[in-house]
Amino acid sequence: ADILEIGVPFSDPVADGPVIQNASYQAIQKGTTLTKIFDMVEGVRKEKCEVPIVFMMYYNTVYHYGLDAFVARCIECGVDGLIIPDLPFEEQSELKTVLAKNEASPILIQLVSPVSKQRVPMLLENARGFVYCVSQMGVTGKGANFHKDIREYLAAVNRPVQFR
């Protein structure tokens, strides 16, 4: 695999469709916690897995854990990137400040959507690692109804971004 994305379950996954909502609910009911996920990642890294690991999660989970403690634990166990769909670019400064304190911090992955044409240059300029391209609007898991201008959108976004 080129990358491993781990979806961190959340108690109120409003941006997700029924499948991911149910998966989050089931995971939480069975005792999955962020601490256990960190421990799992640490175990994977001890097995010499070098595939980049990225967390897909809601910002509330990060905030509740504590920004400094969260970033420190990401570094400690080997999390390479963070995809946080409910954290818009304009509200990333607090987390970015904590991430900037250590070169080993995970990369904050920028999300670009088909309706953000004016924002694409700014988002790409601030992107590190890769860009997460949202291909359909609304909640996740609602079928394969891609945005009508998907080809043009992907062509506009498809350019090299700076790696850390």
Each model region followed by its residue ranges:
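Conserved beta-strand positions in the central sheet of alpha/beta enzyme cores
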Residues: E5, I83, V131-Y132
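Conserved, mostly hydrophobic/aromatic
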Residues: L4-G7, C74, L123, V157
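Short beta-strands and strand-loop turn motifs
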Residues: P52-M57, V131-G138
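Active-site-adjacent beta->alpha loops and helix N-cap segments on the catalytic face
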Residues: F10-I20, T32-V44, V62-A69, I84-E103, ...
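Active-site cofactor/substrate anionic-group-binding motifs, chiefly glycine-
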Residues: A1-V8, S24-L34
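Short glycine/proline- and charge-enriched loop/turn segments
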Residues: P18-A27, C133
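Short beta-strand/loop segments at the ligand-binding rim of alpha/beta enzyme cores
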Residues: K48-Y58, L99-L111, N158-R164
